[in-house]
């Protein structure tokens, strides 16, 4: 095999970086490209219900595998995916967006083709994507095409941001040297500037040496930029109390003896709030300081000794070191921190009270009770997706087993995201370990936006748990504004009929409305095995919500009403 098509080259390269499932929809400008997927052993085409869901699915897949690929067609297809791509950009998720575009000659002649705006401008959609992409490429020359593909894959992986790659329909069948595949794409980070890195290390070590009450706070980019292992070692060596943000949930093993809980500013438990805000040194790993991640910007550190570790810069107090990457800094810090922290005397960490109060089996389910019980159902290695709304807030009250991976979209907050993301996560989990469970918590309102992807799960024999929280509409919106407004209402669905409607043969669909029904179901040994796709309708009161969401809604309503 001395030569291969450019299309096959793309998929061979993706397989080399462990991307085995491709998401998207066929369209006439990408059909020849899609043919090449089936030429690569071990590669599969998911085939989504729509492009938005495909982008969501790619996001969910990438959070577990490091990167993903979604393929759409020019214009109508790519624009449908952009909300999902924007979410991946905001949340630091590496998704390669490949767009099949018209041939180079059609573009040069400015033909009035379908899927265009009718003005001869073939660059407009590419330009739209450039604002939500780390980099973009429009292939125009077969000779440079392989190196451009390699650059796009590397950038997607390293930056953990979306990258746009346009492939003209007339180029995908042209041949390139197969020998190019023998040189792997370099996915390593470039070394830090030694002088800047040493200055950071020396300053941080001095701060650690002087600290009497330090804490470690892990946020979203701790997971996204692959420093979970370094952060765990930092906790092990120093014994500093460790906390996570809502977006960082799952970044630290919550069974670790030095884990103290979830910090969300004023929405934190009193014990966690006091522990974090009274610290004399905060080591913040991968922070994304958005409103819902910080209790509407209510962080209130008493110290100015704050070290922020980011993927592409470090901030120590008021000094910023651009280009200094946290991966290398943390690795070198681990070799020296033991001596710097030797004077630290460990203090007790907060422990959330476990809700073990007996309740009658006939007690109707309520959010506060459910989220304290979810942790009892979870197992090590689970992937837990929580939808924007009550689920994303309620999960902060759940104690995770070790090695639990949490997926939510706290910053971008696109309603329905987890419907598609669950599909992607289920594909990824199957590739990593077929026994790994994927568990979704989604509201009845959010489900209506992306429900079609359940059919794709069934088609591929995937076996997620789909917990549908039925509170009869958009509770999070009602809490912010319009409690009785018609626009926060939805049509009630027969949720238990969804799986057979989409063609499922081996499935379980069940409704739980009381604590007794919940306990009986979640403790059942057969139910705990991911042997089939399951949909569980959880009946909840209309205005019932986790206490932290009620407080957040009040803060959000207040901010929305401000005049200046």
UniProtKB/Swiss-Prot annotation:
Family: Belongs to the TPP enzyme family.
Domain of life: Eukaryota
UniProt entry keywords in alphabetical sequence: Decarboxylase, Lyase, Magnesium, Metal-binding, Thiamine pyrophosphate
Positions of thiamine diphosphate binding: 390, 413-415, 445-446, 471-476
The name this protein goes by in its record: Pyruvate decarboxylase
Record bears the keyword Amino-acid biosynthesis: no
InterPro entries: DHS-like_NAD/FAD-binding_dom (IPR029035), PDC/IPDC-like (IPR012110), THDP-binding (IPR029061), Thiamin_PyroP_enz_cen_dom (IPR012000), Thiamin_PyroP_enz_TPP-bd_dom (IPR012001), TPP-bd_CS (IPR000399), TPP_enzyme_TPP-bd (IPR011766), TPP_PDC_IPDC (IPR047214)
